[in-house]
UniProtKB/Swiss-Prot annotation:
A single BP term in Gene Ontology: ATP synthesis coupled electron transport
Main location: plastid
Keyword Thylakoid: yes
Protein name as annotated: NAD(P)H-quinone oxidoreductase subunit 2 A, chloroplastic
Subcellular location: Plastid, Chloroplast thylakoid membrane
Top-level division of the source organism's lineage: Eukaryota
Subunit structure: NDH is composed of at least 16 different subunits, 5 of which are encoded in the nucleus.
Gene: ndhB1
Length: 494
């Protein structure tokens, strides 16, 4: 009986994850016992399990932090925020996938299984409290990401992207584990994060050369997951070759999970080397902001452009991680990440819809879309403007708060480069918007001329447009109500 109560006590800390596991089991059972006509049940179960997980997480929001499973998992306010963000990403991505899966005749069950399992791995990663659990959760997320990126097996580009993703992902995980091994040895054989810190203090190794090796190795491993320059080589190919709903999912969840990991590892274990990891992240953020935005200008593929744009966006988020020592630092990072989820997924919703109706991803082929589908063109324009940071959209207020916190924390170089690169990003976003709104027949390509006109431009007719409406509304209005969001983040964290 005592063991049963202990199981209930510890299991309560991962109740949202348990709901996802139950949803996965139900998906498998229904797939084995029913025919293909019951496909709506697959989406219903997936969405229901995600929504229930969010609900349980919100109900447990005010509970005291707790370490369970012999120190393997920590339920803290910080982990709850990032687990919520991952669940939110996953919930918004499923409606994006419904029409795509139907049109491309992809296997539904496996797709949803991999997506939910990746979300599960990301949630466990956000609360993992020891080096082994971190690695297992990270690999759970990564392996599902590899499988999702290569889901269209008959597509040569998808196979090529998956192979690059798998090889480079495996190499980065090896480097990350190499850094963990240094921490394990220097701390005297500890794996729990706080015990690693205590072990480094007891062995007087917190300022040794080995710590610098561990720091660099872990930064390289996490930099790959965040698509930081120069560990970004996989990103454009995976974005271009993978199914668009998969790219939408990976573009946000991987950054949320890796940001949570980076924040906990650097701020806790490398507390005594704060100057070193601040400098290292500053260099990576500057490179990402500059190269990401400059190379994005030259792209002709919409998804490749967003791949390079995402490198610049994660550079902005790094400012919040570096400024995380202050009360506003983490709050600014979380606030901008919330805005980025809606801005990015809204953009991808428009790309999925356009791709299904035209079969192209070339930026030039978007010319004149406003004449055929004003709703999609207007939605894409708003999301791109928000990504660029145009007032009064959410992206502007998120970046403004992020840069202000970075300036307050003394990251003057980062904050000087950030707005400049943001202005450059506005250039290539506006170039796309100009194409969208053109009415010159000479510029309109056959793809748009043959575009299947919607019966009504401003009424949602499918799940993609429903997701689009949610994301566009959030991208335009959340900046106006940013103060309550910041207050919730600060109150939760501190």
């Amino acid at each position: 009986m005592k063991e049963f109560h202990l199981l209930l006590f510890h299991g309560g800390s991962i109740f949202p994850e348990c709901i996802l596991i139950l949803g996965l089991i139900l998906l498998l059972m229904i797939d084995l016992t029913s025919d293909q006509k019951d496909t709506p049940w697959f989406y219903f179960i997936s969405l229901t399990s995600l929504v229930m997980s969010i609900t349980v997480l919100l109900f447990r929001w005010r509970e005291e932090p707790m370490i369970s499973f012999l120190g393997n998992f920590q339920t803290s306010n910080f982990s709850k925020i990032f687990r919520f963000l991952i669940l939110l990403c996953s919930t918004l991505c499923i409606p994006l996938s419904v029409e795509y899966i139907k049109c491309t005749e992809m296997a539904i069950t496996e797709f949803l299984l991999f997506l939910l399992t990746a979300a599960l791995g990301g949630m466990v990663l956000c609360g993992a409290n020891d080096l082994v659990t971190i690695f297992v959760a990270l690999e759970c997320f990564s392996l599902c990401s590899y499988l999702l990126s290569g889901y269209t097996k008959r597509d040569v580009r998808s196979n090529e992207a998956t192979m690059k993703y798998l090889l480079m992902g495996g190499a980065s995980s090896s480097i990350l584990v190499y850094g963990f091994s240094w921490l394990y040895g220097l701390s005297g054989g500890e794996i729990e994060l706080q015990e690693v810190v205590n072990g480094l203090i007891n062995t007087q190794m917190y300022n040794s050369p080995g710590i610098l090796i561990a720091l660099i190795s872990i930064a390289v491993g996490i930099g790959f997951k965040l698509s930081l320059v120069p560990f970004h080589q996989w990103t454009p190919d995976v974005y271009e070759g993978s199914p668009t709903p998969v790219v939408a999912f990976l573009s946000v969840t991987s950054k949320v999970a890796a940001s949570a990991l980076a924040t906990r590892i650097f701020d806790l274990i490398f507390y005594f080397s704060s100057n070193e990891w601040h400098l290292l992240l500053e260099i990576l953020a500057i490179l990402s902001m500059i190269l990401g935005n400059l190379i994005a200008i030259t792209q002709t593929s919409m998804k490749r452009m967003l791949a390079y744009s995402s490198m610049g966006q994660i550079g902005y988020i790094i400012i919040g991680i570096i400024a995380g020592d202050s009360k506003n630092g983490y709050a600014s990072m979380i606030t901008y990440m919330l805005f980025y989820i809606f801005m990015n997924l809204g953009t991808f919703a428009c790309i999925v819809l356009f791709g299904l109706r035209t079969g192209t991803d070339n930026i030039r082929d978007y010319a004149g879309l406003y004449t055929k589908d004003p709703f999609s063109a207007f939605s894409l324009a708003l999301c791109l403007l928000s990504l660029g940071g145009i007032p009064p959209l959410a992206g502007f207020f998120g970046k403004l708060y992020l840069f202000w916190c970075g300036w307050q924390a003394g990251s003057y170089l980062l904050v000087s480069i950030g707005p400049l690169m943001s202005v450059i990003s506005i250039y290539y976003y506006l170039k796309i918007i100009k194409l969208l709104m053109t009415e010159r027949n000479k510029e309109i390509t056959p793809h748009v001329q043959n575009y299947r006109r919607s019966p009504s431009s401003f009424i949602s007719k499918n799940s993609i447009e429903l997701s689009m409406i949610v994301c566009v509304t959030a991208s335009t209005t959340l900046g106006i109500v940013m103060n309550p969001i910041i207050a919730i983040a600060q109150d939760t964290l501190f």
